[in-house]
């Protein structure tokens, strides 16, 4: 009979799902409010491209040392610190007074958000038995599309009615609440679960989960945004071609 996951494991998994959702919600806000930021700071496409590429690069690079820390220190504390940091910096993004201030704040947001994946995946490995682990990873990864969906659904309306800075302020609030909850969550013993057998189905799920967190996947979603939100511009471009 499959081993039943304890309530503590389910509770922490829910927190990890929420952290992942906020991770992708917060990072998507600039993509939604791109036009008002462009107008206020007088930016061209080159500056916006540098901003997106720099965030992706720092996010990818910072994950390596943060993964090292997740192997040696309390992962719940690493997640709490990372979530608190990127929530503060998300709120600070709304206080940016120039493009350069916004640029450096967003780079620091990338460092904070890079703490999520290594610590969360390590926790899931110790919280769930092998026959439940792929399902737990699937629930955790559900935060990615739901975070994007939530951001594209409400950030535009908030920016239109209250200005582009307000979504950054509001996005920070739930981060502080969840950070406090994960801070005091019980840390599972490392290596307490037996290794998961490498079946074909589980390898496929792992590959999909890994790709969905990759910069290539996120970049593809952001590149697809203009065709969804501004079809008339693409239509004009197509006619010129």
Task: Enumerate the predicted regions with their spans.
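Helix-loop-helix hairpin linking two adjacent transmembrane segments in secondary transporters
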Residues: 140-186
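Juxtamembrane intracellular "pre-TM" segments in multi-pass secondary transporters
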Residues: 2-5, 190-221
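Cytoplasmic helix-loop-helix junction between adjacent transmembrane helices
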Residues: 105-145
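Extracytoplasmic
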Residues: 11-45, 234-239
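Residue-level signature of mid-helix packing/kink "hotspots" within the transmembrane helices
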Residues: 28, 56-64, 114, 148-149
């Amino acid at each position: 009979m499959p081993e039943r996951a304890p309530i503590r494991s389910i509770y922490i998994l829910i927190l990890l799902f929420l952290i992942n959702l906020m991770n992708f919600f917060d990072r998507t806000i600039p993509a939604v409010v791109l036009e008002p930021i462009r107008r206020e700071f007088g930016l061209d496409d080159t500056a916006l491209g540098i901003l997106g590429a720099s965030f992706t690069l720092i996010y990818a690079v910072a994950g390596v040392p943060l993964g090292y820390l997740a192997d040696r220190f309390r992962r719940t504390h690493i997640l709490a610190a990372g979530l608190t940091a990127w929530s503060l910096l998300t709120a600070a993004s709304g206080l940016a007074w120039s493009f350069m201030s916004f640029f450096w704040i967003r780079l620091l947001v990338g460092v904070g958000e890079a703490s999520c994946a290594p610590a969360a995946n390590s926790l899931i490995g110790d919280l769930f038995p092998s026959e439940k682990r792929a399902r737990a990873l699937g629930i955790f990864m559900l935060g990615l599309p739901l975070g994007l969906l939530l951001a594209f659904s409400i950030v535009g309306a908030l920016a239109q009615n209250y200005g582009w800075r307000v979504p950054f302020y509001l996005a920070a609030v739930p981060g502080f609440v969840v950070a406090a909850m994960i801070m005091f969550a019980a840390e599972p013993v490392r290596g307490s679960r037996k290794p998961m057998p490498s079946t074909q189905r589980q390898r496929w799920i792992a590959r999909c989960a890994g790709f969905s967190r990759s910069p290539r996947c996120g970049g593809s979603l952001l590149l697809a945004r203009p065709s969804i939100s501004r079809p008339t511009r693409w239509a004009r471009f197509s006619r010129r071609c």
